[in-house]
């Protein structure tokens, strides 16, 4: 499971159009567009289809600082161990981790993703989760969960049932602290992109970002 450091929240729009949004860490507020989670290093991670395992690429070993490559390798080792123990499959095209063959595991509008409900899908990656929203109704539904008293537990149960992978306890706990902010940010981003479908990335340190697809 993911749970690298104490939860923080960093929010940004798609990389081509980043926005400054308040970041709260230990009751302090700053301004930042940095996303220091491991997902920014995904380009240096490759899939070994024969072993059904993730590997740090030779380029990553060469160009990344030792502290970064060590952290990535540690996360890959943990993820690979879970994949092997539970017979998960890595989709070599998307790097998503699935319970069934990516060639038979599909969902409307988001091929290969697991369905949470109509219009809302999720993919599990080595660095965290990606939530897809293909309708305004799905956004409203997800925000409704975020507004509940047990938002983290509810989302954690839905994700675990859909992907077979349990969210880290720190992530579930962080939902309780940042659910209102996430709900508001999701609403605002979706409102700005009414003509597009949106998705939200959530990494292991509870940094989340919104994008269109």
How should each PLM-predicted stretch be described?
Residues 1-5:
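Bacterial N-terminal signal peptides
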Residues 8-120:
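N-terminal propeptides/leader regions of secreted preproproteins
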Residues 9-14, 169-181:
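Canonical hydrophobic alpha-helical transmembrane segment
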Residues 79, 86, 164, 189-195:
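Short loop/turn hinge sites at secondary-structure boundaries
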Residues 150-173:
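Short hydrophobic membrane-inserting alpha-helices and related fusion/pore-forming segments
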């Amino acid at each position: 499971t993911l749970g690298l450091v104490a939860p923080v929240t960093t929010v940004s729009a798609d990389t081509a159009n980043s926005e400054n949004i308040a970041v709260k860490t230990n009751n302090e507020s700053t301004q930042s567009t940095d996303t220091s989670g491991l997902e920014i290093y995904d380009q240096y991670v490759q899939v070994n289809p024969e072993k059904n395992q993730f590997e740090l690429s030779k380029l990553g070993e060469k160009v990344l600082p030792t502290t970064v490559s060590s952290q990535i390798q540690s996360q890959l080792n943990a993820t690979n161990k879970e994949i092997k123990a539970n017979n998960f499959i890595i989709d070599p095209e998307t790097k998503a981790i699935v319970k069934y063959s990516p060639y038979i595991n599909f969902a409307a509008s988001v091929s290969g993703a697991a369905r949470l409900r109509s219009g809302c899908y999720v993919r599990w990656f080595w660095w965290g989760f990606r939530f897809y929203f293909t309708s305004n109704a799905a956004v409203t539904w997800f925000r409704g969960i975020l507004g509940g008293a047990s938002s983290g537990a509810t989302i954690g149960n839905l994700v675990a049932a859909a992907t077979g992978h349990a969210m880290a306890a720190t992530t579930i706990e962080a939902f309780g602290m940042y659910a209102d902010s996430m709900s508001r940010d999701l609403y605002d981003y979706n409102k700005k992109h009414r003509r597009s479908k949106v998705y939200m990335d959530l990494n292991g340190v509870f940094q989340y970002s919104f994008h269109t697809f």
